[in-house]
Amino acid sequence: MSNMVLNGNIDKSDRNSILDILQSLENIAWGQPGSARCDFRSDVITRPSLRMLSAVLKTTLGDDVFREDLTTAHFEAHVAEISGREEGMFVITGTMANQLCLHALVSTRPCGILLSSESHAIHYEAGGSSMLSGAMLQPVQPSNGKYLRVEDLEEHAILTDDVHKCPTSIVSMENTAGGAVVPVHELRRIRDWAKQNNVRTHLDGARLFEAVATGAGTLKEYCSLIDLVSVDFSKNLGAPMGAMILGDKKLIQQMRRTRKGIGGGMRQGGVITAAAREALFENFGLGAEIESQTLLQVHKVAKRLGEEWTRKGGKLSKEIETNIIWLDLDAVGIKKSQFIDKGREYGVILDGCRIVCHHQIDIYAVEALIDVFHDILKADPIKNKNSDR
């Protein structure tokens, strides 16, 4: 048996030989962006690369429920190490990661979870917190319009002994939050506030790699400040699926049982984790700080599109910090449906005012979207508004 199979890693010669074979095959979807090349709806639509398929073909096939899959175990240990945490646990989706984290942090009932009113856990996780944790969500509009700060927690957290109230026991944050980078110093303030008030913390880091790419902080700096952190490999990193929870050993052990209880245990987990590992290495790097230029190039594309929109007379709802652009369609009298239809005319897939860039968007799609901006904005905004009445 080769060393590669024993340790769950792929050496360069093995990888290149498999890639040569894969590249000679016809009608293979892996490594082909397909419709993702012109899809600005989200970065979840990225397609896995041939290198990821190569990693899958060379993975170990142990049983992860029995903790016998080396590829999975080594990947969990690697991500935990570069994040500065005791242990990591791989799960199939970011939603599962978030919900397992929140469930693990519920120590008493009733339990209130304070989070941004725009958070993924509120709008896009099928009410998982009520089903799995029996917790009450306490949504708060961030006062800076971007992300939660200590001032928001001080104003809205319920820390009273009043028996009429559901006490705030957990604070859940996102980074990035709608594309905005949460500074390390702000998370440090929240950590200190939470400790003083006996509140647990969770970070939805589905796009944490985007924040690290900006130079705002390393994985270790961010992950060291929060009780439980979840990171995603299937967005701009391009893995077919997968996320990881990072925290202390005791909590992770507890969550392994809960993961099994909700059907998240994986048998031959290496088939999934090998691709996720390769996605991390390809599009981020091996360490706690970014090594690949992939994400930074995507940020440049996002900023260019934002500049084109404003140069043609459009307005932005939020500053562009990473890979997400928020267009103010109302300011130019454009309905969401009109914008989507116009994109379809030019061959790009849109979903309203949020434009999400990723590494598989090609230059032709970028130019086509700029043409959409021009077509939309060349009309008189007042006329557009009147036509909607």
Swiss-Prot record:
Give the disruption phenotype, in one or two sentences.
Reduces pathogenicity of the fungus on maize.
State the similarity comment.
Belongs to the threonine aldolase family.
Protein's gene: TOXG
Q: Per UniProt, what is one GO molecular function of this protein?
A: alanine racemase activity
Q: Could you confirm whether the keyword Hydrolase appears in this record? A: no
Share an example GO biological-process annotation for this protein.
Answer: toxin biosynthetic process
- What cofactors does this protein use? pyridoxal 5'-phosphate
Which keywords belong to this entry?
Isomerase, Pyridoxal phosphate
Q: What does this protein do?
A: Alanine racemase, part of the diffuse TOX2 gene cluster that mediates the biosynthesis of the HC-toxin, cyclic tetrapeptide of structure cyclo(D-Pro-L-Ala-D-Ala-L-Aeo), where Aeo stands for 2-amino-9,10-epoxi-8-oxodecanoic acid. HC-toxin is a determinant of specificity and virulence in the interaction between the producing fungus and its host, maize. TOXG catalyzes the conversion of L-alanine into D-alanine, an essential precursor for the production of the major forms of HC-toxin by the non-ribosomal peptide synthetase HTS1.
Q: Which InterPro entries match?
A: ArAA_b-elim_lyase/Thr_aldolase (IPR001597), Low_specificity_L-TA-like (IPR023603), PyrdxlP-dep_Trfase (IPR015424), PyrdxlP-dep_Trfase_major (IPR015421), PyrdxlP-dep_Trfase_small (IPR015422)
Q: Which reaction does it catalyse?
A: L-alanine = D-alanine
Q: Gene3D superfamilies attached here?
A: Aspartate Aminotransferase, domain 1, Type I PLP-dependent aspartate aminotransferase-like (Major domain)
- Record protein name field: Alanine racemase TOXG
Q: Name one GO cellular component term.
A: cytosol
What Pfam families does the record tag this protein with?
Beta_elim_lyase (PF01212)
EC numbers for this chain: 5.1.1.1
Q: Give the first-level EC class, as a single word.
A: isomerase
Record pathway:
Mycotoxin biosynthesis; HC-toxin biosynthesis
PANTHER family xrefs: L-THREONINE ALDOLASE, L-THREONINE ALDOLASE-RELATED
Any additional notes?
A: The genes involved in HC-toxin biosynthesis, called collectively TOX2, are organized into a diffuse cluster that spans >500 kb. All of the known genes are duplicated or triplicated within this region, with some variation in copy number and chromosomal location among different race 1 strains.
* N6-(pyridoxal phosphate)lysine carried by residues: 235
